[in-house]
Each structure stands twice: as structure tokens, then as C-alpha cells.
Swiss-Prot record:
Similarity remark: Belongs to the tail fiber family.
Biased composition (Polar residues): 172-206, 241-258
Record region (Disordered): 147-213, 241-270
Annotated GO MF terms: structural molecule activity
Gene3D superfamilies: Phage tail collar domain
Name of the encoding gene: stfQ
Transmembrane spans: none
Keywords: Repeat
Regions of compositional bias (Low complexity) in chain numbering: 261-270
Full protein name: Prophage side tail fiber protein homolog StfQ
InterPro entries (UniProt xref): Phage_lambda_Stf-r1, Phage_tail_collar_dom, Phage_tail_collar_dom_sf, Phage_Tail_Fiber_Structural
């Protein structure tokens, strides 16, 4: 029976009825309607099973109802989704789906940066026109910021710019005393040996005379041989009188000559090496440790990348 689809608050017949859908106002052009209505109540409902027009193919199914008052309107038709007719808008093709297994369900693919056939999966090609499924391994999803980043653009890990403050409190440790220790007696090393350079001139010395041993005369006017100077009472070179037999002899002497000097140069012998014994008795020292600060180094810490507590899932995408 071909009946025009009921609209608004129009009621159908009581009981169970079967209608044929054939271009008569239902969601599909062809199909069958199961109409249900109680014998006494006015509430009713309809189930539409459509025809696909292709042998062996699944067709969509729809359902609607109307409450049990005479002025109640029919609800909109709602499609019944099945594995053969999943909701295209409920989870759009191309949306990443966290999947807790390495075994991928039929009709889906892991998101690992692989290419796909755009002609075989036109809906997926709308989401990824490049024909490449994004590689979601190790990546998280972030809402596109208002700064104008492109959809599907990648952002490497990083931390927000910040500073650290560090200080060491100033402390006055006052004056402290070292522990007492007796170092005993120590000897210095043997040293101090040295030399002196010598240079200069010795004093003039060596001037002398010689007594004449040649001929001599008995008077002051005698002439001495061998080139000696004459002797007279005024001569400075008269030697003391030497007595002879019956006469006095006067002997002469040479002039004073032979005075000379010597130049000196060289190095005096090395001398002066010595050591000392030093007694270092038991003693202490006072050390003043005034108010001061210290430089602080803050060492690097952390992991190779920024992470939060997480559980690893595979991302899969529906192929359609």
C-alpha cells in the first residue's frame, strides 16, 4: 500500500501496518514503512527501511515517532547508523582517532605519514588534499592558535621564556682560630755563595837606588866612571864615608828609579754559602672571615624533551 507520508499532527491507523515508500514524501525514494499505533492510545511510531536500488547493497534506515496527544506533531526522521552506514558527520573522515592497539580495525589506517589513493578515498582526500596522512607518532594535537599558524603545521618542542633567581645569604663568620701545631725546627737550604768582580790599579811602588861598586875618588870633586854623576858636597847621592888606609873615600849611588804600578782584573773566588736553623714552635693563627657572598651556578636538568604524564595510543583514521 502506497500512502503519502504523515505530516504535522496527522495520525495514522491503529495497529500494525506496512506501507510502501515510492516517491511519497519519505526520506528515501524507495523502501518500506512499518507503522505502529496502539488500539486505544494516540501515540505512534514509524520505521523506514529504504532500498538502495543496487542488488545486494545495504540501504539506510530511519525512525520517527509522535507522542500520545492529538495535537502532537511527528518528530523529525532520525537515521539509524550501522557498520555499513556509519555516521559521516558523527566522526568525520580524516579526524585522528586514539586507538589502544597495534591491530587496526577494518576500514581504518594508522597515521604514520604514508600516502593514500585519493581516488579510492575521496572523503579522506578532502581532509588531506596532499594525499599524505600525517605522521602522528610521538606528536600531540594542539588547537590552532590565533597567531595565524597553518592547519597541519608542526611546532617543535620548547619551553616558554623565563628567568631564574638565585642568591646566597650574606654571613659574617667573624674571626676564627686555626688549630695549634708544632712544626719543630727546620733548616733553610744552603745558599748565599757568591763571587765578586775585581778591577783597578795597584799603588805605585818599587822605587830604589844602588850603591856604586866602581872607582871612587878621595875628594868631593872626583869624577866617577861608568856614567855616574859627580859627587860634591851638595850632591844628594853621597853615601857614608868609608875609611881606608891613610885616606877618605867617597862613594856614590845611582838615582832612585823603578817605581811602577799593576792593573788588576778578574773574579774573586766563590764564597759565602751558608744555612740557617729556624725554630717554628707550636702556634696558631687568627683568620678573619668577613661578610661576603658567593657565585651560584644553576646546573641544567630535565629530559631530552618536554613531556607530561601520558599513555601511548596509536592514532588511526577512517578510510572513506
Amino acid at each position: 500500500m502506497n500512502i503519502t507520508a504523515l505530516t504535522d499532527n496527522t495520525q495514522g491507523a491503529a495497529g500494525l501496518e506496512l506501507y510502501e515508500v515510492y516517491n511519497n514524501g519519505y526520506p528515501t525514494a524507495y523502501g518500506n514503512i512499518i507503522h505502529l499505533k496502539g488500539m486505544t492510545a494516540v501515540g505512534e511510531g514509524e520505521l523506514l527501511i529504504g532500498w538502495s536500488g543496487t542488488s545486494g547493497a545495504h540501504a539506510p534506515a530511519f525512525i520517527r515517532s509522535r507522542r500520545d496527544t492529538t495535537d502532537a506533531n511527528w518528530s523529525p526522521w532520525a537515521q539509524l547508523y550501522t557498520s555499513a552506514h556509519p555516521p559521516a558527520e558523527f566522526y568525520p573522515v580524516g579526524a585522528p582517532i586514539p586507538w589502544p592497539s597495534d591491530t587496526v580495525p577494518s576500514g581504518y589506517a594508522l597515521m604514520q605519514g604514508q600516502t593514500f589513493d585519493k581516488s579510492a578515498y575521496p572523503k579522506l582526500a578532502v581532509a588531506y588534499p596532499s594525499g599524505v596522512i600525517p605522521d602522528m607518532r610521538g606528536w600531540t594535537i594542539k588547537g590552532k592558535p590565533a597567531s595565524g599558524r597553518a592547519v597541519l603545521s608542526q611546532e617543535q618542542d620548547g619551553i616558554k621564556s623565563h628567568t631564574h633567581s638565585a642568591s646566597a645569604s650574606s654571613t659574617d663568620l667573624g674571626t676564627e682560630t686555626t688549630s695549634s701545631f708544632d712544626y719543630g725546627t727546620k733548616s733553610t737550604n744552603n745558599t748565599g755563595a757568591h763571587t765578586h768582580s775585581i778591577s783597578g790599579t795597584a799603588n805605585s811602588a818599587g822605587a830604589h837606588q844602588h850603591k856604586s861598586s866602581g872607582a871612587f875618588g878621595g875628594t868631593n870633586t872626583s869624577i866617577f866612571p861608568n856614567g855616574y854623576t859627580a859627587i860634591s858636597n851638595l850632591s844628594a847621592g853621597i853615601m857614608s864615608t868609608t875609611s881606608g888606609s891613610g885616606q877618605t873615600r867617597n862613594a856614590g849611588k845611582t838615582s832612585s828609579d823603578g817605581a811602577h804600578t799593576h792593573s788588576l782584573s778578574g773574579t774573586a773566588a766563590s764564597a759565602g754559602a751558608h744555612a740557617h736553623t729556624v725554630g717554628i714552635g707550636a702556634h696558631t693563627h687568627s683568620v678573619a672571615i668577613g661578610s661576603h657572598g658567593h657565585t651560584i651556578t644553576v646546573n641544567a636538568a630535565g629530559n631530552a624533551e618536554n613531556t607530561v604524564k601520558n599513555i601511548a595510543f596509536n592514532y588511526i583514521v577512517r578510510l572513506a
